[in-house]
Amino acid sequence: MNGMRIVGRFIVSAALCLCAMAAQTQAQENAAAPVIPDMKWAVKIPMRDGVQLNATVFQPHEQKEPLPVIFTFTPYIGDSYTDRAMYFAEHGYVYALVDVRGRGNSGGAFEPFVNEAKDGYDVVEWLAKQPYCNGKVTMWGGSYAGYDQWTVLKEFPPHLATIVPAAAAHPGVDFPFEYNIFGPYVEQWLTFTSGVTGNEKLFGDGAYWGAKALEYYDKHLAFKNYDTVAGNPSAVFQKWMQNPVPDSYYDQMVPSSKDYAHIEIPILTITGDYDGDQPGAFTYYKRHMKYGTAEAKEKHFLIIGPWDHAGTRTPRREVGGLKFGEASVLDLNKLHTEWYDWAMKGGKKPEFLKKRVAYYVVGARAENWKYADTLESISNETRTLYLGSNGKADSVFESGTLTEKQAAGAETDKWTYDPMGTRPGDAEMDDDDGLKSQRGVLNNYGNGAIYHTPAFGAATEVTGFLKLTIWLSMDVTDTDLEADVYEILPSGDSVYLTGATMRARYRESLREEKLVTTGKIEKYVFDNFTFFSRRVAKGSRLRLFVHCPNTPGTEKNYNSGGVVAEETGKDAKTAHVTLVHDKEHESTLELPIVK
């Protein structure tokens, strides 16, 4: 988009000079000087406690009238988004890049997720009073800058006209842990946002962070010490270790049910099938749909593309080795502009938003955008598949079954998870096949059970959230569980579709732990699969892989039943897990089908 935008700055005109005497026409092309937005550096925005935040403000060249103001509120240093600011300043908006408290050139100290709500309120109201603003203020951004929009909204600044949160992180859901399981990435992110500078090179050094994660993993160290292992001891990291569940510490950072009920402004939520913050984005969306007024919900639109985290702002045709059609690459700058025009300038609603939910279907050579009035109305059939086996389901060659009729018999499937084993993690570090990889399934080392459907008789659209219900018994009081679903193409190639995780002690509630009673058969419901939309090809099969994760990418559970972040190899207990699927214990996978 940048290249197109630069070309667009030059206006080429042809001047016709008519000579009456010679009747000759001469064409001349004169390139006009590029129209560059005006910029104000080091603008100081006062907060209620006296701290001053730093902003860089971009305005349309020689701005002639007050306009709506867009701002990005970021810990990643405002300069990172200069290209966006230039774009919107060229399209009729004032744009402010604002460093959050304690980052960049802003005063104060940065503590993630703590100050942005009230600070953001003050930013909105200060911008609204500036002579270049017409009283309407909005926000742009994703990830942390998506979270910012929701936390500012819960303060209800009078001049906030709309928000467009993309890939919005949700404290207590997908950050700093995901469903109560931490990972080394949180320390990488804390290093990225340490001090006042960008730290982009260090943050992006995959070799360094991979080596540190592997060191923690191979040496069986306590996760609570990972910040020291990584070289950046962090008080925030330690505070998070003391808050391992979604409690009041995280609740105060996000809207409450009462807050959702008072929302009135238009909202456009953006996420992707492979967005790491998809759980957060959907948590905000679903809670607004649950608690919001009917009028407000009519003004909340949702876009779900075949995108990863970065793709929710700059879509690409390829993600993790999968390639998508040209239509998947939306011009999100253009869409944002149209949305802002509609919400703040009285323009037309973006033509792309034909209904309140837009999602992109991939697969089976028939990709396209589709629409629905609500998230729930996308699918019109639930297909229930029953897990079964002859007692052997530990490999892709001797797997269990997923069938629409429950298989006869009462065989069980068993696997073993030894937290002292490091072969899976060591192999994972060399795996660069992304969403097409089968390494973890093919080399599960006896840790997991695998089930396949029969080949699909016709191409079938599966869109939405899967639900897995399984009955397990184990000989440890806690372990971690993961369920992954793949499409296995007729060629034998694999495509990752969705996954879900669970720490066994939180099987009944994410807020309260209940250790497992060893030897007792209990129900485990995985209802936190990520959203996806795929047309499964004729001849393809679905594969379900249930196992205990053993990876450098997550905090390791040593199965002792103690505080997981404090466990080391000395606490390790091998887990023997049994999956039961008989008439009294129906283990099922539910698929949302679109017909």
Language-model features: where?
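Active-site-adjacent alpha-helix of alpha/beta-hydrolase-fold enzymes
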Residues: P279-H300
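Glycine/threonine-rich phosphate-binding loop and adjacent beta-strand/alpha-helix elements that clamp
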Residues: N30, A296, G325, D331-L332, ...
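Accessory cap/linker subdomain of secreted extracellular hydrolases
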Residues: E90, K154-H262
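Alpha/beta-hydrolase fold nucleophile elbow
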Residues: Y132-Y144
